């Protein structure tokens, strides 16, 4: 069953999977692996290694303007999955305000160098990308160069027989601190992956494929070809990640956030238990990476006391009739919100004051102010006391310059001897201080055939304000 709806909320493939028909029209090489069926739709042959490789190259070109070479017989990365991983790291960096001069380490970058290429292109990160295979390093270096990212990504060959994974790389540049490291380790222990991968005898190099090697397995949905080094390692992924943990104990906060992708759920427990032995010195987080028919996990840990790995709140979202973005921007403008483009995926809205609550009281106050002075005097007359303390200054509202006194009204209650009295007053700020936004949110709109899906993510401010605002906008836009 597809898990696309559980992808990272900022992943554009979540609500808009690749349009094979449009890709076939635009890219002749991709068209070779497509077939038109009677209902006018296009089917794609996922069972061919060349087809899967072409799909990845096409998506990288169209959606990220990346021209990437992936040699036959090497692992073909799935773009939505890799973007999910990068977005989770981006969440952690933003939550900890680690967004300037970000330098990361990609362990086992592979021929595609996809983590570093997406990170540099999409998030403006810098990378040291390492690999123990000389061919992978050579091809990765060529991919970086032809995409004009040599100033952002340095591809380094490391000795695969050395036990340490990070120490040599980090100590090469002693005065540099790294924001994060990331890794997609080989999943299988040597000799234990034979039920899922068999050697491809048609290949001139040592290549393995996930073609059916056992009568007890069903045929895979998508072809996977890879070299031995990309699939197998002594001790499997648990042993490999333990080597990263060993280095992290020595490096401590030279790397702020250590992360790795985990391919098998059974690997999480022993790794988590190992990290928990360090007690309060370490913070741990496990996140799920959902995409297509595949589930992976991200294990993150830190020794830095200033870094928080608490679970990041998932954005709130709702669906509405088209054009959702146009109506959303109109309503935010009415609420005196300020919009700016953050990147190709999101816009940011800022509000200096809460203008979306107590709408009935606001409408009543506005109606009172628009009435004639005689009616207003009659309406306001009641035998109650009201005291309003005015601030010192020029008498202007610090947010809207509308004056520091807005309204005072008395409202009858069920008790004949009691009235509810509501007063609203604004006070100017001393010394001409300009307040910052009380809430900042990241908004992303995904377009479907008949509706738009709008996602809201809290950047700063109150969660209560976020929920109030989203509910207010939903009531207006979805009706």
Swiss-Prot record:
Effect listed in the UniProt record for changing residue 110 to R: In oj32; at 25 degrees Celsius animals are either sterile or maternal-effect lethal and display a protruding vulva phenotype. Enhanced nuclear proliferation defects in germ cells in a weak loss of function dhc-1 (js319) mutant background
InterPro entries reported in the protein's UniProt record: METTL16/PsiM (IPR017182), METTL16/RlmF (IPR010286), SAM-dependent_MTases_sf (IPR029063)
EC class (word): transferase
Main location: nucleus
Binding site for S-adenosyl-L-methionine: 82, 108, 131, 164, 184
Catalysed reactions, as listed in the record: an adenosine in mRNA + S-adenosyl-L-methionine = an N(6)-methyladenosine in mRNA + S-adenosyl-L-homocysteine + H(+); adenosine in U6 snRNA + S-adenosyl-L-methionine = N(6)-methyladenosine in U6 snRNA + S-adenosyl-L-homocysteine + H(+)
GO molecular function terms noted in the UniProt entry: mRNA m(6)A methyltransferase activity; U6 snRNA (adenine-(43)-N(6))-methyltransferase activity
Key words, A-Z: Cell cycle, Cell division, Meiosis, Methyltransferase, Mitosis, Nucleus, S-adenosyl-L-methionine, Transferase
Subcellular location: Nucleus
GO biological process, one term: vulval development
EC number(s) per entry: 2.1.1.346, 2.1.1.348
UniProt region (Involved in dlc-1 binding), positions on chain: 420-424
Oligomeric and partner information: Self-associates. Interacts with dlc-1; the interaction is direct, and is required for nuclear localization of mett-10.
Family that this chain belongs to: Belongs to the methyltransferase superfamily. METTL16/RlmF family.
Entry protein name: U6 small nuclear RNA (adenine-(43)-N(6))-methyltransferase
Organism in which the protein naturally occurs: Caenorhabditis elegans
Taxonomic lineage: Eukaryota, Metazoa, Ecdysozoa, Nematoda, Chromadorea
Gene: mett-10
